[in-house]
């Protein structure tokens, strides 16, 4: 008898959990809620940018933010070292694009989203080419990498700084 009551309680809680999930998913597809959520997404001073900038500042690196002088207005630019850093969100810049594309094809308004993200990806590629032509080192970080592995991101930036300094020293030595 006790086993039966315990099982019923467990099944009731499980059913309640799934009902809440279904209601939440259904409610989150409401166009007004989607529109409200999209308005909260910023293109400048995002949480991932702020986190990386704070870490760079703490290490003593000075930078320009959203530097409009350069193509693509990189999120962070270390002008002294000619390093352009982009903090990319996984969705809008198409991380794991083939998988994301399949998910988008099943969702609402797939043509719009696929076209938008493909355009973002090609624009990112063109921007990178322009910056490389200008002699900049270009670094892209995914948002989750910044959130979860900020120290590793800093280490990658410091390695790029070291590479820049080393190549500049080599050029100076050859001129002497």
What are the roles of these predicted feature ranges?
Residues 9-176:
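Nucleic-acid endo/exonuclease domains
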């Amino acid at each position: 008898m006790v086993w039966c009551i315990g099982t019923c309680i467990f099944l009731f809680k499980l059913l309640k959990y799934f009902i809440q999930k279904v209601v939440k998913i259904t409610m989150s597809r409401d166009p007004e809620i989607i529109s409200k959520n999209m308005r909260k997404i910023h293109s400048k001073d995002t949480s991932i940018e702020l986190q990386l900038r704070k870490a760079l500042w703490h290490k003593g690196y000075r930078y320009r933010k959203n530097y409009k002088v350069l193509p693509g207005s990189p999120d962070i630019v270390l002008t002294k070292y000619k390093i352009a850093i982009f903090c990319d969100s996984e969705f809008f810049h198409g991380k794991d694009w083939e998988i994301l594309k399949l998910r988008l094809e099943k969702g609402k308004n797939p043509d719009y989203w696929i076209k938008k993200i493909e355009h973002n990806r090609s624009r990112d590629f063109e921007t990178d080419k322009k910056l490389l032509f200008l002699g900049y080192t270009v670094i892209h970080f995914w948002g989750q990498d910044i959130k979860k592995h900020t120290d590793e991101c800093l280490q990658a930036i410091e390695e790029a700084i070291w590479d820049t300094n080393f190549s500049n020293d080599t050029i100076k030595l050859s001129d002497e």
